[in-house]
């Protein structure tokens, strides 16, 4: 264990002990957890869509007709849960989040230093990430988030009847961000599954906007990988030099997926103010879910998501002081034959390059749960192994046990690059 990790663990443990015995570093909010169910079944309730066109930003909610969805009990998606805790901003309003991120950008707050009264510790229920059925169910939700609405393609166990919030016949093919909302019978548990990247048949319907957001979040500098490429922003300054200030401004623009994901979260929170929310998603959807999870201290399970730590830092997401990475509520499931998950889908010979994607980020927040399919199955590095259906059928379902989850210390993104601030 590195000295830095040891110090972070010690500091967090010290803060936690002090919180119990005297005034404390974190304010604690303990919700009643005596009757936490061991398992719940969830079904689709809503689909949220934020259209992010160049000239306008539109938002629609589609409500699923209850009589038509999951009529058979075996079609419900089971989730096993257990008790846990979350450390997050006490005030989770949009204004408070914006204020924290602004002060972090200005150097007033940092991962190691922010006022103790900003934070609270809350007892919650979290997914049992050692339960294969639970992970498979979350994977199914992530897979379903790709499907076009109304019925199309391989949507799993979905009925034909829909109630559509105006306008009627909304075009789901336009650029934007989608979140599919699942709930249990009493709406105490809500899962938001975010749609992933539409690339090479992996997903449908939003590929152009996905490419821009992928390249902003997961490339070192606006997808500046060759003189022949059209970059997605103008932050490049010189050879292996990129403006940090410019990058941070770009990822926080209202037309970007992170901003739209906040709209989805607050909309769901308004509908279900007392519910426990979890997040999931595949690829870009998984990374977007992880960024939301970090913003609010929400349990998040992703599948084959590209490294999200670089994006989290550029967005200046809330980081409780002293909280070790492995204590955050983000788990990234993936395997070692997926170049996107590993941050190796780069270079002129890669399909990412051919599609205009620069997937260069390597480091994940939280914990990585890695299947060794290279050793166990003889797979080779290929983007074809990135598809969610492949992950469901040939990895999660095929393995008897789930992989162990752990944080990868000393990970470095974009080690050749320098990122000066504009005023430095």
Curated annotation (Swiss-Prot):
The lineage of its organism: Eukaryota, Fungi, Dikarya, Ascomycota, Taphrinomycotina. One of its GO terms (cellular component) is membrane. It comes from Schizosaccharomyces pombe (strain 972 / ATCC 24843). This is Putative lipase atg15. Keywords: Autophagy, Endosome, Glycoprotein, Hydrolase, Lipid degradation, Lipid metabolism, Membrane, Signal-anchor, Transmembrane, Transmembrane helix. It is found in: Endosome, Multivesicular body membrane; Prevacuolar compartment membrane. The active site is at residue 283. It catalyses: a triacylglycerol + H2O = a diacylglycerol + a fatty acid + H(+). The gene is atg15. It is an enzyme of class 3 (hydrolase).
